[in-house]
A protein has these predicted regions:
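Active-site microenvironment for binding and transforming phosphate-containing groups
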Residues: 1-144
Length: 144
């Protein structure tokens, strides 16, 4: 059986999807929408979920954050997290680092576009799949 869980319409909020696999072969998924109004409570709930490490073999985490367009050193325009301090606080609350098991996806926050306003979904089947903006992510260890 396949189960799906999602959040959408982030419109400036942050969302996190966590897929955990356990020693017994079972899997779990957690999707959370972080409102700036109750950030402290949201981080507390997230911390509680992330500290349940009993029997976890692997964990994949995707964080969607509001983004902003900047010009990088090569002169290319790229989208980066708008508030790196909030992202760092969230990663710290979950006892995570911005490494290969954590993928950060900044999304554009504009009033004129419905697409790209923050959709995050987990499909939990034989092989868990995470989607951002309805696009399947490659979460293998070799991805960049």
């Amino acid at each position: 059986d396949t189960a799906k869980i999602a959040t959408f319409g982030l419109c400036g909020c942050t969302a996190v999807a966590v897929v955990s696999e356990y020693l017994d072969g079972s899997k779990s998924a957690h999707v959370q929408h972080f409102s700036p109004i109750c950030q402290e409570l949201s981080e507390s709930v997230f911390r509680s979920v992330m500290t349940k490490n009993q029997g976890v073999v692997s964990r994949k985490v995707v964080v969607m954050v509001p983004g902003q367009w900047v010009q990088n050193g090569d002169g290319n325009t790229i989208i980066v997290p708008k508030d790196q301090a909030s992202l760092n606080s969230l990663l710290q609350a979950g006892n995570l680092s911005d490494d290969n098991s954590v993928k950060v996806y900044p999304y554009r926050v504009t009033s004129g576009h419905r697409y790209g306003q923050g959709t995050l979904m987990v499909e939990l089947g034989d092989e868990p799949v995470i989607y951002t903006e309805c696009i399947q992510l490659n979460l293998t260890k070799s991805s960049s």
